[in-house]
Amino acid sequence: MNPRRKSRFKLVIFVVLGIAIASGLMLYALRQNIDLFYTPSEVIQGKDNNPNQKPEVGQRIRVGGMVVEGTVVRDPKSLKVRFDLNDIGPAITVEYEGILPDLFREGQGIVAQGVLTQPTVLTATEVLAKHDENYVPPELGEKMQKVHKPMGIEAADLKGESARDRQEKEGAK
């Protein structure tokens, strides 16, 4: 090999090796940040009822479900909260220390992200409360009522059929 070709060959090897190392480090970093989503039933029974597809203890996961009524236990001396979460099947226990979202309540849908510390216990680092598409924050709802009352708009008008629509229907009859 002549010196020029040898130099190019070394450069190509160096670039390919650099790309391989960078790709490996990126994949490793991404693998650490992947949080798989499960339902409480899937945590206990495995995805598609396959016990081989259960999350492992120590694995970071996200679990979504409904807060079981009567299971919320708050520690009066700290921000620790413990509650059960279920879907249509068995429930898992979620332990969380921090301020819960305003929309958090029993019977409400939530998503908890954290580490599975026991097969049926998730120690959450984050709790997100879900709401339906008709949700209006309380502050905004109050302001809307103040603005719409002087205009002659009622709360029922904001939820579907307006007074004008009702009058048009009655006039068409």
UniProtKB/Swiss-Prot annotation:
- Per the record, ranges on the Cytoplasmic side are 1-8
Q: Which UniProt keywords apply?
A: Cell inner membrane, Cell membrane, Cytochrome c-type biogenesis, Heme, Iron, Membrane, Metal-binding, Signal-anchor, Transmembrane, Transmembrane helix
Which residues hold heme? 131, 135
Name of one Pfam family that matches: CcmE
Query: PANTHER family from the xrefs?
Result: CYTOCHROME C-TYPE BIOGENESIS PROTEIN CCME HOMOLOG, MITOCHONDRIAL
What family does the Swiss-Prot or TrEMBL record give for this protein?
A: Belongs to the CcmE/CycJ family.
What name does this protein carry?
A: Cytochrome c-type biogenesis protein CcmE
Organism equals: Haemophilus influenzae (strain ATCC 51907 / DSM 11121 / KW20 / Rd)
